[in-house]
From Swiss-Prot:
InterPro entries: Heat_shock_Hsp33, Heat_shock_Hsp33_C, Heat_shock_Hsp33_N. Pfam families: HSP33. One of its GO terms (molecular function) is unfolded protein binding. It comes from Streptococcus pyogenes serotype M49 (strain NZ131). One of its GO terms (cellular component) is cytoplasm. GO terms for biological process: protein refolding. This is 33 kDa chaperonin. SUPFAM superfamilies: Hsp33 domain, HSP33 redox switch-like. Redox regulated molecular chaperone. Protects both thermally unfolding and oxidatively damaged proteins from irreversible aggregation. Plays an important role in the bacterial defense system toward oxidative stress.
Length: 290
C-alpha cells in the first residue's frame, strides 16, 4: 500500500515527508495507457500533488496543473486531504529516451509554461497561484512554487522508475522544509547533506526506498516520525455526476444525441471510466427538464 510518512528533526530545525507512490502511479498508467515519458511526467505530477495535499487540513481539494507548450500538453491532478489523488495527461503517447542510457526524458519536452495550484477550501473562494516552469522536470518546478508562492524554502525529489517493459517499477519522492526554529548553522548542515544525497532514482531503487529516503535525509540526526498515512489513486466520478451534467444541456442537444447517436457515451478524463446513456436514459432526462 502506498503511504506518506511525515517526520520532524528532533531539533525542530526542519521537517520531511517521504512517499511511496508506486501503486498510485501504476494505476494511473494502467487507466490512461501512457507511454514512458508521459507516465513519468504524470507520475511526478501526482506525487507533487500528494505532497501538497498532505499539507492541507479539513476537506480542501488541491488541483495541480502543469501547463507546458510542447509535447505533453496539460497535466492535471486533483487531490484531497484523505490521501486520494486522480489525474490525467493530454498526450499519453510521449515516449522519448536517451539513446545511450535509456533514461526517460521529460524536461526537454515540456516546453515553456506554468505550474498552477488551486486550493479549494470549500468556501467558494479558491486560492490560485501560478509560477513559471523552471526546468520542466516537475520536481524543480514544484520546489520553485513552494519557495515563491508559499515562501517556504523546500528541497523536492520526485521520480518514477520503469521496468524493461516501461511499466511502473517504483515511484515516490520526498520534501524537506526548513522550519523557523532552524539556526544558520543547522540550515547550512542540512543544505550540505541534501547536496550530498544520492540521486532520487538511486534511492528509489533501494530495497526499502522509504527507509532509504529517511536515512539519506537525516543521516545520524535524530528525528521523530509524526504519522504514516495511506495514499491511493481514486477517482470520485459517478454516473449521477455525469447525468447531472447532461441535465445542464439544452433539450435540442439531448434530442440530437437520441436522433443521431441513439444515446451518449461519456468518458471520465481522470480515470477513463465509460458511462453509457441509452435513448431511454436521455428521454428521461429531457422529461425531467420539462
Amino acid at each position: 500500500m502506498d503511504k506518506i510518512i511525515k517526520s520532524i528533526a528532533q531539533s525542530g530545525a526542519f521537517r520531511a515527508y517521504v512517499l511511496d507512490s508506486t501503486e498510485t502511479v501504476a494505476l494511473a498508467q494502467e487507466k490512461h495507457n501512457t507511454l514512458s515519458s508521459s507516465t513519468v511526467a504524470l507520475g511526478r505530477t501526482l506525487i507533487a500533488n500528494q505532497i501538497l495535499a498532505a499539507n492541507q487540513k479539513g476537506d480542501s481539494k488541491i488541483t495541480v496543473k502543469v501547463i507546458g507548450d510542447s509535447s505533453f500538453g496539460h497535466i492535471i491532478s486533483v487531490a484531497d486531504t484523505k490521501g486520494h489523488v486522480k489525474g490525467y495527461i493530454q498526450n499519453t503517447g510521449v515516449d522519448i529516451k536517451k539513446t545511450a542510457t535509456g533514461e526517460v526524458l521529460v524536461g526537454p519536452f515540456m516546453g515553456n509554461g506554468h505550474f498552477v495550484t488551486i486550493i479549494d477550501y470549500g468556501t467558494g473562494n479558491p486560492y490560485t497561484s501560478t509560477t513559471p516552469l523552471i526546468t520542466g522536470e516537475i520536481g524543480e518546478d514544484f520546489a520553485y512554487y513552494l519557495t515563491e508562492s508559499e515562501q517556504t524554502p523546500s528541497a523536492i525529489g520526485l521520480n518514477v522508475l520503469l521496468d524493461e517493459n516501461d511499466k511502473v517499477k517504483v515511484a515516490g519522492g520526498f520534501m524537506v522544509q526548513v522550519l523557523p526554529e532552524a539556526s544558520e548553522e543547522e540550515i547550512a548542515r542540512y543544505e550540505k547533506r541534501l547536496q550530498e544525497m544520492p540521486a532520487i532514482s538511486h534511492l528509489l531503487a533501494s530495497k526499502n526506498h522509504v527507509d532509504a529516503l529517511l536515512e539519506a535525509i537525516y543521516g545520524d540526526e535524530p528525528y521523530k516520525r509524526l504519522s504514516e498515512e495511506p495514499l491511493s489513486f481514486q477517482c470520485d466520478c459517478s454516473r449521477e455526476r455525469f447525468e447531472a451534467a447532461l441535465m445542464t444541456l439544452p433539450k435540442a442537444d439531448l434530442q440530437a444525441m437520441i436522433d443521431e447517436d441513439k444515446g451518449a457515451e461519456i468518458v471520465c478524463q481522470f480515470c477513463g471510466t465509460k458511462y453509457q446513456f441509452n435513448e431511454s436514459d436521455l428521454e428521461a432526462i429531457i422529461n425531467d427538464k420539462a
